Curated annotation (Swiss-Prot):
Organism phylogeny: Eukaryota, Metazoa, Chordata, Craniata, Vertebrata
Post-translational modification: Interchain disulfide bonds may form in peroxisomes (Potential). Interchain disulfide bonds are not expected to form in the reducing environment of the cytoplasm and mitochondria. Acetylation at Lys-471 activates malonyl-CoA decarboxylase activity. Deacetylation at Lys-471 by SIRT4 represses activity, leading to promote lipogenesis.
Source organism of the structure: Mus musculus (Mouse)
Keyword Glycoprotein: no
Range of residues in the leader sequence: none
Entry protein name: Malonyl-CoA decarboxylase, mitochondrial
Positions of the UniProt region annotated as Catalytic domain: 190-492
One GO MF term attached to the UniProt entry: identical protein binding
Record function comment: Catalyzes the conversion of malonyl-CoA to acetyl-CoA. In the fatty acid biosynthesis MCD selectively removes malonyl-CoA and thus assures that methyl-malonyl-CoA is the only chain elongating substrate for fatty acid synthase and that fatty acids with multiple methyl side chains are produced. In peroxisomes it may be involved in degrading intraperoxisomal malonyl-CoA, which is generated by the peroxisomal beta-oxidation of odd chain-length dicarboxylic fatty acids.
Subcellular location: Cytoplasm; Mitochondrion matrix; Peroxisome; Peroxisome matrix
Amino acid sequence: MRGLGPGLRARRLLPLRSPPRPPGPRGRRLCGGLAASAMDELLRRAVPPTPAYELREKTPAPAEGQCADFVSFYGGLAEASQRAELLGRLAQGFGVDHGQVAEQSAGVLQLRQQAREAAVLLQAEDRLRYALVPRYRGLFHHISKLDGGVRFLVQLRADLLEAQALKLVEGPHVREMNGVLKSMLSEWFSSGFLNLERVTWHSPCEVLQKISECEAVHPVKNWMDMKRRVGPYRRCYFFSHCSTPGEPLVVLHVALTGDISNNIQGIVKECPPTETEERNRIAAAIFYSISLTQQGLQGVELGTFLIKRVVKELQKEFPQLGAFSSLSPIPGFTKWLLGLLNVQGKEHGRNELFTDSECQEISAVTGNPVHESLKGFLSSGEWVKSEKLTQALQGPLMRLCAWYLYGEKHRGYALNPVANFHLQNGAVMWRINWMADSSLKGLTSSCGLMVNYRYYLEETGPNSISYLGSKNIKASEQILSLVAQFQNNSKL
C-alpha cells in the first residue's frame, strides 16, 4: 500500500497519466537571451504588484487576460528545462520583499518595547503578515479563478516537483514557492470540497479505465481482473473534487475478509468465495492499495481523509466489522538491506546482520560467503527458487525488516514512507508477513514481505498525537520481539 505522507518523495506515488496541459502554442522553443527576455516580460505583466497596505482591499484585480497569458505561455513550453527555468525565475524574482519584512518587523519590536495598546500592536502585526506574502501567491490566486485554473496549478506543482527531483531548478526560493503552492492546494482540496464515490462494475467505462490505469501498487492485468477488484467482497472508492466530479484524485481498494489478510495473492488473484456477499463471512476490512493520481497533490492529506471517510461508509454498511487494517508493501527494504551488505562486505570479518549459525546455513546452500551471494540473490529475487535458502532466510529477513520499519528513522520519524503515512494516521505497526507478495516486484523491492498497519479506531487519535509529537511508534508484540532480536545481534 503506497503511502501519501511526507517523504513520499510523497514520491512519486504513481507513474500515471497527467492531466492535459493547458492550451498554448505547442512546441515553443526559446533559447538564450530571447528566452530570458520573453520570460521576464511575461512575468512582469502577469504577476500583479503588491498594493500598499492601505490599498490592499481597494486595488482592482488584474485583468483576466494577464493570468491567461501566463497559462498559455507556460502550456506552450516544450521542454521540462524551459518550464523549470520559468518557475525558477518566478520563485527568485517575485517572492517576498525582504526589505519590507525587515521594516515591519522592526516596527512590531519597537511597539512591543513601548508597550503600546493592543490595537496598535495588532495592526502592526497585520502589516508584517501582509509583507510576508510572496508576490507569486497573487498570481496563483488569480489563476485559480480561471476556468480549469486549479487543474493547471496542480500540473504546475507536479512540474515543479519533477524539476526539483531532476535538479533542473534548486534553492530555498524554489522550496518556499513549492510550500506556498502546496498550502494553497491543501485549502482548495480540503475534505469539504471532496466527494466520496464508490466504483462498481456498473460505473462509467471512463472511470473504470482511469482506476485501472492509476493502480500502480498492484497493477491491473485485464478487464476480468478489474471486475474482480470492484466485485463481491471488494470495495473501491475515490475522492473527486467538487469542480471535477467523476475525476479520481486518490483511489482506495478494500478487501472484505474473514480475518486480517497476510498475503496479497489471496486478494488480487483468488476469486471470491461466492458471487453474492454473505455478511457473516465479513469481519475485517483490508486497505490493500491507495494511489494518488496527480503528482501535484503530493503532501496534501487526501489519503488520510479518504481512509477516514471509507471507514465510516463501511461501518454503515457492515456494522459487524471488527477489524480495519492495511496490507502494505515495504518499498525500499531490499535497497536498504543491499546497502548494509555492501558496507559490511567491504569490512572483512564484520557481521552484524546474521548469526554464526545463519551464516553457516546460508553459505552451505549458496556455496559462497554470505554477503556476496546474497547481494545477487536479493537483487534478482532468485533466492525463492531454493526451498532451503528460503527457509534459511526467513528468520533474518523478518528480523531485519522489523528493524528497518521500526528503527530506521528520518528526522526522528519512520524512514519508510508507507510506515510514516500510517503511523501519522494513528495506526499500529501490527504484523510483518512472510512471503506475502511473491510477485517479482514484491521480491525485488521488499523480499516478498508485507506489513499490516492496524487501525484500532478508538486509539488512532492518541497514537497519531504520540507519533507526531513525541515520535513514538506504537507496535505489536511481534514487531517488538523481532526488533529486540535484531538489537541483540547487532550494534547498529
